[in-house]
Amino acid sequence: MTEGNFVDYVKIYVSSGKGGKGSTHLHREKFIEKGGPDGGDGGRGGHVYLVGNKGLWTLFHLKFARHIKAGHGGDGGSDRSTGADGEDKFIEVPLGTVVKDKETGEVLFEITEDGEKRILAKGGKGGLGNWHFRSSTNQTPRYAQPGLPGLEMDVILELKVLADVGLVGFPNAGKSTLLSVLTSAKPKIADYPFTTLKPNLGIVAYRDFQSFVIADIPGIIEGAAEGKGLGHYFLRHIERNSTLLFLVPVDTPDIKAEYDILVNELTKYNPEMLDKERLLVISKCDMLDDELKAELKAELDVSFKDIPYMLISSVAQQGLTDLKDKLWKMLNE
């Protein structure tokens, strides 16, 4: 998916370098009529690496870099000198990048740590020079190995945002507003559905200089698990969150029904979603007086016996400190 500079899915072609040829050189020196073999080995072909970079949040820099090629190994020389190794290529990617084989869809590996370096395409081995093939019956071999070819492959890079808490809700539930008041993030906010078309990340500053990361996942609609709307693109990012915050506005006609739809979509996409910690947050509660809040709590106590809930107002900034405390506790239990 792409919006502006945010890209979380790219297809690229990579090729590692081929190995250099071994040398068939025979030693030549004044007054030595028959010098033996001294051909060196070819250098290895360059590798293509993926490297994790915590400073990256998008695959945008690879959107137009469709062909990435490492260098070829140099040929072996005389005096058993080895050819130079081919130039390696390093592709920096955000943490949470999953690498898939384009043809089979097989997950090859994923990058989750800063500085983590994995070989995507290994360079071809350099060929052995004729020096290796000398023997009592063939003292001047004129054969050397060719270098092995490099590896060519089409791969898919898919970014799954890494965050501690994922904000889950229907479009226009107020997730972006909540993110903006909890963190210093500045997501696009407007009073219409699907304002957010990309995951927005923010860092919540907590007590004693501690912090955690919260992600505003684009709004989910019924049928998202079947790909309705942009469902699969959105749901992919929720897989990495350890805690899910379900945000439902207090003016929703049926809070329980809306929550059940959200849970159902997540479960259909990946049943393991049910294993995550969940917190229900009812927003826009500054619209209620104390009596209505008491009535709402009584209803929620019946409908959500096993799921913790909280009442907040992002605009009036009510209940936000308690919300931070609750999330921190859930993340560190």
Swiss-Prot record:
Gene: obg
HAMAP family listed in its UniProt record: GTPase_Obg
Keywords from the named record: Cytoplasm, GTP-binding, Hydrolase, Magnesium, Metal-binding, Nucleotide-binding
Biological processes, Gene Ontology terms: ribosome biogenesis
Family classification: Belongs to the TRAFAC class OBG-HflX-like GTPase superfamily. OBG GTPase family.
Assigned GO CC terms: cytoplasm
Domain OBG-type G: 163-332
Disulfide bonding pattern of the chain: none
Designated name of the protein: GTPase Obg
TM segment ranges: none
Record text on subunit structure and interactions: Monomer.
Positions bound to GTP: 169-176, 194-198, 216-219, 283-286, 313-315
Gene Ontology molecular functions: GTP binding; GTPase activity; magnesium ion binding
Name of a matching Pfam family: MMR_HSR1
EC number: 3.6.5.-
Compartments in which it is found: Cytoplasm
Function noted in UniProt: An essential GTPase which binds GTP, GDP and possibly (p)ppGpp with moderate affinity, with high nucleotide exchange rates and a fairly low GTP hydrolysis rate. Plays a role in control of the cell cycle, stress response, ribosome biogenesis and in those bacteria that undergo differentiation, in morphogenesis control.
Entry binding sites for Mg(2+): S176, T196
Segments forming domain Obg: 4-162
Cofactor or coenzyme needed: Mg(2+)
Major localization class: cytoplasm
Enzyme class: hydrolase
